[in-house]
Amino acid sequence: MSNDPSVPPTSPDSEWKISTRTVSHGRPAPDPGAPVNESITLSSTFHAGGPLDYGRVGNPTWTALESTLADLESTQSALCFPSGVAAISAVLDLVPVGGVVVAPAHPYSGTRGLLNERQSAGRFTVREYQPSPTADISAELQGADLLWIETPSNPLLEISDIAGLSQQAHAAGALVAIDATFITPYIAQPINFGVDLVVHSVTKFLAGHSDGIMGSVATNSDELATRLHTIRTLGGAIVGPFEAFLALRGIRTLGVRMDRSIANAQTIAERLLTLPVVEKVRYPGLSSHPGHDLAMATTGAGAVVCFEVHSADQAEAIAESTRLWTHATSLGGVESLIERRARWPFEHPDVPSNLIRLSVGIEDVDDLWNDLYQAISAHS
């Protein structure tokens, strides 16, 4: 890498730290009179003879976003998709017909739905494993084609050893994919733990403003990138240039948003522990969490907190009684969200009916706590 201070921000030789690269990467070349931000290219086709020909194959605004994501993930390439589920679907399309996917027992409900649907259709077989910091899944991996990792898991916040599981999978000849939505590359780059494919719901923390839906897959494998590009092009699973622009804009503030949200989440989790009505708090930043040491050494605690109260009715009433916390699904935006996760009929039956999931935003932490406390107190 170059130490030349004249290296432009868009150069892969830059040695700037990730909080700087989130701001600087993916911008146009610094020519006199050039725009500071990547333009929104609204064109369905392009002049012949250049790198782009038709809008289903590529777009300059995507290119800037994908280049930025690849840089942040420390990978050779990244591809964007119209949603996180579309990105997951594309990765599952890499599995051969009749193959085997090894997946956690309690993944994100969208992942679970895709796995169940494809297994029911005979596309591939799914073997489940129970995530833990010391999980040995060598038996499940025998003859497998793909290992799926999700850490922290959504919404139970189970922690897995990314490096350890990746080693086990590669020893069995399987590819490794991870849903790194809760982590973000600001905290850790899973590719450095041996993962082959890093998947994000860009909708969440990366874009960070709850105003666009998008997914991504990053990889160091040219072969996998080519196959994913073909899957995207033939399936038409492309993103709009405006959504790509919004994601780029959101990434500029990723560092400051994550720092604030994680600090807020830690405070909220610690204060929840003091309330008699709260039966359990799930947050990797707490020393009582079974995956605490591993999480803090690798992927961090994140900005999602889950807690359980006495009953499902009580949990629902609390979620409906906040004023600052928005009662809505999703996570990762600047605004704080609250919901009883099991209100969704497609959620895993093992998710407790009395579990409340918090996506902690960047508001003042005392305002967040006071609002949550009044909602809990009103139904205690």
Residue ranges and their predicted role:
Residues 1-6, 127, 257, 320, ...:
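PLP-dependent enzyme catalytic core of the Aspartate aminotransferase-like
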Residues 280-356, 360:
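Conserved C-terminal alpha-helix-loop-beta "cap" of PLP-dependent enzymes
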Residues 39-89, 93-94, 110-117:
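Conserved N-terminal alpha-helix of the aminotransferase class I/II PLP-enzyme fold
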Residues 235-236, 322-332, 375-380:
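A common structural junction motif
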Residues 72, 272-276, 322:
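Acidic-histidine catalytic/liganding microenvironments
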Residues 2-60, 65-68, 356:
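N-terminal "arm"/small-domain region of PLP-dependent enzymes with the aminotransferase-like
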Residues 2-14, 28, 78-274:
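Conserved PLP-enzyme active-site core in the AAT-like
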Residues 36, 232-305, 309-317:
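Structural motif of enzymes handling amino- and sulfur-group chemistry
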